[in-house]
From Swiss-Prot:
InterPro entries: Pyridox_Oxase, Pyridox_Oxase_CS, Pyridox_Oxase_N, Pyridoxamine_oxidase_dimer_C, Split_barrel_FMN-bd. HAMAP family: PdxH. GO terms for molecular function: FMN binding; pyridoxamine phosphate oxidase activity. This is Pyridoxine/pyridoxamine 5'-phosphate oxidase. It comes from Ruthia magnifica subsp. Calyptogena magnifica. One of its GO terms (biological process) is pyridoxine biosynthetic process.
Length: 212
């Protein structure tokens, strides 16, 4: 079966991006665009596609950015998940923020390091208790014969941790994506898009315009 989508076309007309408008610091530029995405009520602006790979396979999924600073971009996950197993083999990753409502996207390339236990505990403690229990209940990426098994595991965790605080699982925590390249893309008319890439070289960020 073939479905022809060639007639689907959207002209990008919202705005442009000039070199003079860019911060010399890519994290400051990301902060500005992220704030603008929030102000524009972009759905889940913190949602980002995370691409990982091992020796034989490339995988991609959506995860949530939890915070960022000049050191990198942090997300949390199960350390026994498929993504984590791939990261043990190959720490190089790519992120993509597709803010289509603003005709923008941000692409980030770099590598990951695990955050320390204190950072993981601080974030885990801020989560709703049901989410904490879910982290304990789910053996992420393992096979499930039915949803009922997952729900039963969740109920078991509710009983197990019915009193007191839910502890941080030793198989759960954060990764920090430390970027070497950050690209800002703004859609333009006639597919002549504006693209600027920040590349880290000798501890300094170099900015270049890219052809669309």
């Amino acid at each position: 079966m073939k479905i022809d989508l060639t007639s689907l076309r959207h002209e990008f007309t919202q705005s442009g991006l000039n070199r003079a408008d860019l911060s010399s610091n890519p994290f400051e530029q990301f902060k500005l665009w992220f704030q603008q995405a929030q102000e524009a009520n972009v759905v889940e602006p913190s949602a980002m596609s995370l691409a990982t790979s091992d020796d034989s396979e490339i995988s991609i999924r959506v995860v949530l950015l939890k915070y960022f600073d000049r050191h990198g971009f942090v997300f949390f996950t199960n350390y026994n998940s498929k993504k984590s197993k791939q990261l043990q083999i190959n720490p190089n990753v790519a992120l993509l923020f597709p803010w289509l409502a603003l005709e923008r996207q941000i692409k980030i390339s770099g590598y990951v390091k695990k955050v320390n236990t204190f950072e993981s505990l601080k974030y885990f403690s801020s989560r709703p208790k049901a989410s904490q229990l879910g982290a304990w209940a789910s053996q992420q990426s393992s096979n499930l014969s039915s949803r009922q098994i997952l729900l039963s595991q969740f109920e078991s965790m509710k009983v197990k941790f019915s009193k007191g605080e839910v502890p941080l699982p030793d198989f759960w925590g954060g990764y920090r994506v430390i970027p070497s390249k950050i690209e800002f893309w703004q859609g333009r008319e006639n597919r002549l898009h504006d693209r600027f890439i920040y590349q880290l070289s000798e501890d300094k960020w170099r900015i270049e315009r890219l052809a669309p």
